[in-house]
UniProtKB/Swiss-Prot annotation:
Superkingdom per UniProt: Bacteria
Claim: Phosphoprotein is one of the keywords in the record: no
Pfam families documented for this protein: Aminotran_3 (PF00202)
The encoding gene: hemL
Molecular function terms, GO-annotated: glutamate-1-semialdehyde 2,1-aminomutase activity; pyridoxal phosphate binding; transaminase activity
One GO location term (cellular component): cytoplasm
Annotated catalysed reactions: (S)-4-amino-5-oxopentanoate = 5-aminolevulinate
Protein name, per record: Glutamate-1-semialdehyde 2,1-aminomutase
Quaternary assembly: Homodimer.
Highest classification ranks of the organism: Bacteria, Bacillati, Actinomycetota, Actinomycetes, Kineosporiales
A GO BP entry: protoporphyrinogen IX biosynthetic process
Family: Belongs to the class-III pyridoxal-phosphate-dependent aminotransferase family. HemL subfamily.
Keyword tags: Cytoplasm, Isomerase, Porphyrin biosynthesis, Pyridoxal phosphate
Amino acid sequence: MTAPTPAPTTSSAPTSAALFERAAAVIPGGVNSPVRAFRAVGGTPRFTASARGPYLTDADGREYVDLLCSWGPMILGHAHPDVLAAVTAAAQDGFSYGTPTEREVLLAEEIVARVEPVEQLRMVSSGTEATMSAIRLARGFTGRPVIVKFAGHYHGHVDALLASAGSGLATFALPDTPGVTGTAAGDTIVIPYNDPEALAEVFRLHGDRIACVITEAAAGNMGVVAPQPGFTAELRRVTREHGALLVSDEVMTGFRVSAAGWYGHEGLGLEHAPDLLTFGKVMGGGFPAAAFGGRADVMAHLAPAGPVYQAGTLSGNPIATAAGLATLRACTPEVYAAVETAATAVREAASAALSAAGVPHLVNTAGSMFSVFFTGLDAVTDYEQARQQDLGAFRAFFHSMLDQGVHLPPSAFEAWFLSASHDEAAIGRVVEALPAAARAAAEGSGSL
């Protein structure tokens, strides 16, 4: 699968273009996270000047219906009044102390009350820190070196987890990016997702050396791919049988697909619960906040209570915890129902428009998260299937939507996110844009 070559979008964004040029002189690639650069779709990334509710406004003054929601955190919509008030009040008391605060206790209590397997919680500042710390803790707790992950699952830019599959089943991984050494990735094994046989084989070969299996609760970075029925339970059974920990990465799904994240949405109960979970995105309300937590006996191995070191100057930052606490408290059952209603309306309209235009596609869901695969396959359940997309069709679809004032994720391999603020007017604008975008996708099919 080759990367598409950049091509200009049909609409004009001169201020964004000028900012992108300036940014490229002082920021590698002109962005602070690669997907923002539009390399997968071509054209000029839109520089956002402001956001409110379901809308983004770019530096050229153009408004877009936002289907990124900051890649997931903005479940209430942008600049929600409750969150804005909480952040404003917290800022009046100072920005950072380097000491414990009541708010971090309140936020930890809120999460522990929501997610039954989480008995204790440690806060950090990013999802990458959360997964990095969780696998360190798993190794420290078990005394074992090997981590098992799934192909296509993304857990942040952790050296040990930036690894691709080897040439055969359950082979030790090679690093997937320059700068990650074979030593860093050498104790990581990558196996196919939703494959119980591969899981059994890797434990047959290496079971006494495996510290943990880490999995996205529902994959969202190869497009949305949920675990197949029975797979989560099998993960729990096999890891428990071999004395390995099960780590569920809920950075994306946590507090978005339900009040208790994927754990609550899937509803398998404590019998099949993971030992450790990681959180981010929604729990920070748009601010840098994340966490990892789980069984008290495992968490007790963290410093200062135990020997596994982990620390952070801004962990539990008072403004970030204020935003997170206000966000979670505002996430009522009515909010989750509104998000689900909005997501259902958009995904059904997208599928109908693509079908009418004769574009082969498949819509995968995980709660209110979803993605559209531009594929003729009947199902997408793993990374190899997810990669079989018509990227030319997606690229044309993306730019048509953008030109009509709807900002999708600029990659065919990302989830679409909606918020409780996506009202009938916002959804109507999306629905109105879809037929032309679907026709553009049909014309762009196979162009890459």
